[in-house]
Amino acid sequence: PYRIKVLNTINFKKSMHYNPFAYLHSEKDILKLVTTLIANTKGEGKAGDDFWVKAETLLYCALIGYIHYEAPVEEQNFATLIEFINAMEVREDDEEFKNPVDLMFDALEAEKPNHFAVRQYKKYKLAAGKTAKSILISCGARLAVFDIAELREVTSYDELELDTLGDRKTALFLIMSDTDDSFNFLISMCYTQLFNLLCEKADDVYGGRLPVHVRCLIDECANIGQIPKLEKLVATIRSREISACLVLQAQSQLKAIYKDNADTIIGNMDTSIFLGGKEPTTLKELAAVLGKETIDTYNTGESRGRETSHSLNYQKLGKELMSQDELAVMDGGKCILQLRGVRPFLSDKYDITKHPNFKYTADASDKNTFDIEAFLSTRLKLKPNEVFDVYEVDTQGA
């Protein structure tokens, strides 16, 4: 049987809890989390202004580092990060003023002067009052979405157990809106942490390969935001029993997000399926990949004058196997499959209604629909500081 895990960013009432802070184990994990956050959210700095991004990175690393190493487990979440930023008052006319967060870092520096969070915070404090205020405004704008109480609650603790997906059969559903990208950064964070956690576990615990293959079916891949270093991940995860299937409406979507790395990502995919479409870039590249076929041409000619003459001409020419206009009007029941080491071939799409397990799906009958709210309501949820009794039962002596 499969374990069921669900992260639903459309309706948080139908979602389990996901806390990215629960998967921080080292300083590099903190940096990866900050990189993903910045890549998929918007601050107040001018687009392309590297200064604000680097300044925010320093502050986030300092605050998250403090929370990870010094705060109680129940306070290691985004809600605490928001409280830190809200408490960081800056007075432009008083450079000597210290806010509560400054005092906390001063106390930490006195105890642990080489602490990761202290070193990052001291670099941030090099900014003058007006600049520091601008950095805080940008951070506040980037994290404004966490003013929503539901989001703070769903990220307060973790139930997804991402690092265990390669240990036993698990079905993880990441549900996001296809019209609103406000919370898509959570999905991107989840994928980033999932890939990194599973790769590290495969190397450190299982000698290079996970015992249970993890297959990621990433539908609407372009809508989840950017997964940092995806071009490197797709090249290395396969050896660790992890595979990724990226589903796109057009290749241009991938290039819009990953720029020059889009070609590297596509090149590292062993299999690609064209289901149809009319986006020019996709059609042009596919037509080139399909190559050419040889055709025989037969020309006849007739010249009339005083005398009539006839001519015959046979010729072999190269023609695109399928031109762009032919690909654009390809039969909806057909697809083109490209496998590594095999020439592309035209195939029929599988009729899912003929699958022997189709009768178990919600498409076959509404009674098969999985009620996630009912599933979650039957699970015991422990809240921070909640008092409960623990009973030890010895079943061996019974």
Language-model features and meaning:
Residues 1-242, 257, 262, 325-349, ...:
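P-loop NTPase motor domains
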Residues 234-336:
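Conserved ATP-driven motor cores of ASCE-family P-loop NTPases powering translocation/secretion/packaging/pilus
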